[in-house]
Amino acid sequence: MEYQYPMDVDWTTEEKIAVISFFQAVEKAYEKGIPKQELLDTYKRFKEIVPSKAEEKTHCAAFEKESGYSPYRTVKTAREAEESTIIRM
């Protein structure tokens, strides 16, 4: 797919990489599956960078609009899944 990840110009390179890693984990859940803990670990790091719920919604909505993949539904599914589960959307 050809699209851009939502970014904030004030983020460091390391923070941008972490945010991209989270969005790539969401992509992986849709495309082939990802271990629950791997997805939740990338989400935890994403939340360290984007602690505001409003800002999270803005970035996730932009990503969903570009890709068609829902970070919200993916994380919700992972949280509700049993341990050692592969998350597939």
From Swiss-Prot:
InterPro entries: BH2638-like_sf (IPR023324), UPF0223 (IPR007920). Gene3D superfamilies: BH2638-like. SUPFAM superfamilies: BH2638-like. Coiled coil: none annotated. It holds the Pfam family UPF0223. Belongs to the UPF0223 family. HAMAP family: UPF0223 (MF_01041). This is UPF0223 protein BPUM_1362. The lineage of its organism: Bacteria, Bacillati, Bacillota, Bacilli, Bacillales.
